[in-house]
Amino acid sequence: MIRTAFLRAVAALAAAVAVTCSGCGSGKPATSATTPALVTPTTQIAGAGVLGNDRRPDDSCARDAAAADPGPKTRQAHNAAGVTPDVVEVPAEPQRIVVLSGDQLDALCALGLQSRVVAAALPDGSASQPAYLGNAVHPIPGVGTRSNPDLAGIAAKHPDLILGSQGLTPKLYPQLAGIAPTVFTAAPGAAWQENLRGVGAATSRGAAADALLNGFSQRASDIGARHDASHFQASIVQLTTDKIRVYGTNNFPASVLGAVGVDRPAAQRFTDKPYIEIGATDGDLAKNPDLSAADADVIYVSCASPAAAQRAATVLDSNPWRKLSANHDNRVYVVNDEVWQTGEGLVAARGIVDDLRLVNAPIN
């Protein structure tokens, strides 16, 4: 059971930890008899596991740029459906890329093109680039936010390629295309693999993108088979300052669980929206709400913001939460929100697969 001591530690660490519900702990490492080669992926803190402590963000981006597809100095790339024009002429070797969506930044990192990014829109509500992509991405200058990019700032960077998102800034395409060749991919989320292919095509690295995705698919299948994933149901939960979000199957993390073969509880098999929300204010929790929609064999919990991380102590120590069977069995894991929710690309997906190695960990 997640105990009050752990939850107080969460609250104390929230101010310093921006993307997870907890920081480091002093508990013993958890190990699994079925995964003897696994090196302390989980630190046990009063019964709750914090995943990703062994992750190395500086190893996230490919060290070298992927090889370009053979062909002329300029190529044709397709925009996402609904964007005019359908086809854009782009340089085969762009050197000054401006990227406006997190999944595209992740894709460029996976392709080893991070050094060519001269600016990137910042995540909404953040003053810095995503930490999970490491120091290769952290110093990249911001140009507004993903929902409100700074057009003047973009123009000042003199880009030779702009990558944008139909799902984030659909009305800005004409203005962006007036600055430099611009390719829009689809809304970030469940379609992340197609968006990676779109970034690959826009940077003349379609073959490299396909190879990366084939490698991911093989590894996801291998992890699923090794850890008997299909016989376990996993829950995806995100805490905000006043809500508990329970995710369905039409979103980024659910697509990764699907690739691994992890089952989902019946209450989370909806597809008409990314998630449902349950009130989690003090007043809501005092009414003893039914949180069974969040329950499963294992629950993966992330926090949407530092304020949500600070609030997590109250939510996870509430009577309604304590009733969940996964909580009783010490099968609640705290995960990185950048990796599970906002990354929405191959590097983030690899991180989720790493966390899913605990899906069949023994009940403690």
Where are the model-predicted features located?
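Proline-aspartate-enriched helix->loop->beta-strand connector
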Residues: 151-163, 181, 291, 295-299
